[in-house]
Amino acid sequence: MRRTTLTVTLLASLAGCASPEATPVMKEPLQVYAAGSLREVLTEIARDHEARTGHKIALTFGASGLLRERIEKGEGAQVFASADTQHPQRLGAAGGWAPHTVFVRNSLCALTQAQVNATPQTLLETMLNPAVKLGTSTPKADPSGDYAWELFRKADAVRIGAYAALDAKALKLTGGPDSPKPPAGHGTYAWVMDQGQADVFLTYCTNAVASQKEVPRLKVVQVPAALQVGASYGLTVRRGALAPAEAFARALLAPPAQATFARYGFGQP
């Protein structure tokens, strides 16, 4: 029932987005800007969509906050898939984009070095250990960083003073405008951990699992319920975009795409 409601919401919000002059096939590729955590899954979904519809799709990935800033400065994205709902909401509030809808969900996990003996029960103690290097993404630029700081606030309810300690020690290693990029063919988080830049890195569970596949010695630790933070991914379409933009947005909520998201570890909306 929830999926049906969300799909109806998306269709309603997209009503009027497509240009009345829309043509069945765009001459130029559809410009889709998407959160970096969607890189693998959205590349697969876009490839399948191209094969099915003939609409070419150009994907641009990055930290959602930085992508939103690029759009605000005039870049021509027609579909925006963010790792949160606040950045799409901000675009919608400015008037040029449709109201967003949640299309997938994620959550935070801890990616750790092999020598770190953390469990869900001891994760907070491990992160607070002064000898442990704690890595995160960059708040405001990347929702993953915002979610990490939300976790820090929850930690303060478990142990007084935890927020101040975690806020002071966290290393913002990814997601910022000047964050180093990994070499071609390497995932960001696997590379950061492989380089020893952090002992524990808070990232999306989908990223953590993918990083462990790339660097098998890394470990994935679930965040305990008291600290868990959910990530709702928001989808929006530029008002006046041609029909293929709306079609691709609809496709992301359709069962075939949702099955692909689930295969990569994402939760249903």
Region roles according to the model:
Residues 17-60, 64-65, 69-75, 82-85, ...:
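Exported/periplasmic ABC-transporter solute-binding proteins
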Residues 95-101:
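Central helical "cap/lid" subdomain
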Residues 5-16:
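Bacterial N-terminal signal peptides
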Residues 6, 99, 224-226:
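Residues embedded in well-ordered secondary-structure elements
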